[in-house]
Amino acid sequence: MRIVVAGYGSTGDTLPLVALAASLQRAGHSVVLVADGAAGQIAGRLGLDLRVLPGSARSMLTVGSPGWSRTMKSGRPSMQLFAEVTRLNTRGWIETLDAAAEGADVIVATTLVVYHSASVAQEKGIRLVFGQLQPSLETRDYPPPLSGVVGTPGWLNRPLADLISATGDLFYRSAINKARRDLGQPRLQLAWEALPILAAWSPTLLPAASDWTHPNVTITGPWQLPSDPDWQPPNDLAEFLADGEPPIYVGFGSMAGLGELSTWRDAIIQGLAGRRALLSSGWAALADTDLPDTVHPIGWAPHDWIFPRCAAIVHHCGAGTTHQAAQSGTPSIPVPFGMDQPFWADRLYKLGIATRPINPRKITSEVVRAAAAEVTRPEVTRKALEIAQRIASEPDGVTAATSAILRTCGL
């Protein structure tokens, strides 16, 4: 079969696509990966055919993007952010996907490109599968992750999800239909209830909702690349790790574009005074500053290698980082910024493998100091190891997703 795997976003949004595409290719299928250009190096190493979507995700998620800044400051997705992405890219994304899907049997698309992919699938008469890195189906069990809120009463969760879905649907259909008119095509016909959904998260972290009504949902587990057996840490990192007790990892991945980040970083470092720590630079270049001897700056390192070697993990709770943290057996100090991050932070806390999430806008050295003392208690560490063992017993996510896609296509 010829399969298109498509998505857009930060590193945490892109690596699952790479993992799924590589799994499908290993299974003997012809695969085209449609994603941000930042996937180029790893896609090349894995021999994947990458088609680059116009518009760099990294440039969108910076201080130069008013929508991103507003989203991060409010903690909730700003329609201005979606407007920027859609206004700049709709026509180009449809054209890129259309070329990639020539001769394809199925498109597997994640949230930001699922409407564009539906447009192409409709025009070519091919199947579409919706890959979700965070849940969007209505349920009483929890609020919609992209609402940026947690702790809402059950009766409110379904109406809130309906509102978010309806708003997004109206917005995206309008943009897609304008592009289709320009291309001489009829209006988009998309029936969500007919789409097979692959839920790319651990059922230990988030079990199936008790009241989902969608007829075709498969929780596959997270889509992750295998560990790289050839990766070796830089000498300075290896020496730092060997020179004392396990450090506390601090990193916010793709979070960038907020002037307050350096202030929050300083509060965290002050709160960890007297403890060994690793500070990951990330997109915001957080480690580009003078640091105390107890804090070691690092660039990129595989989470599945570094996290198990740490005493705790301070992170933003993106879906990918959340899964890697839970799998590592190391407890977390969640500092969620917005989007779906408060949702995943709340999941870690409710599982007993993280402190109560810290609002970055209220972070102080005292708050961090108390969280570090809490998260390193033996009972929290034991619970983190227990959850890691439960996740390790789950089926492999990309293998399960590959099987589900083939079933969808009648194979």
Residue ranges and their predicted role:
Residues G40-Q41, A57-L61, Q134-D141, P145, ...:
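Short gly/pro/ser/thr-enriched loop/turn and capping motifs at secondary-structure boundaries
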Residues V34-S78, G151-P153:
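Conserved nucleotide-sugar phosphate-binding/catalytic loop shared by glycosyltransferases and other
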Residues A39-L46, S119-E123, D141, W192, ...:
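Short loop/helix-cap segments at secondary-structure boundaries that form the rim of catalytic
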Residues W201-A312:
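Donor-nucleotide binding loops and adjacent catalytic segments primarily
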Residues S30, D49, R127, N216, ...:
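Residues at the starts of beta-strands that form the adenosine-phosphate
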Residues L88-P159, T204-L205:
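Conserved nucleotide-sugar donor-interacting segment of glycosyltransferase catalytic cores
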Residues M1-T11, L15-V34, A38-D49, I107, ...:
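Nucleotide-activated sugar donor-binding and catalytic core shared by glycosyltransferases
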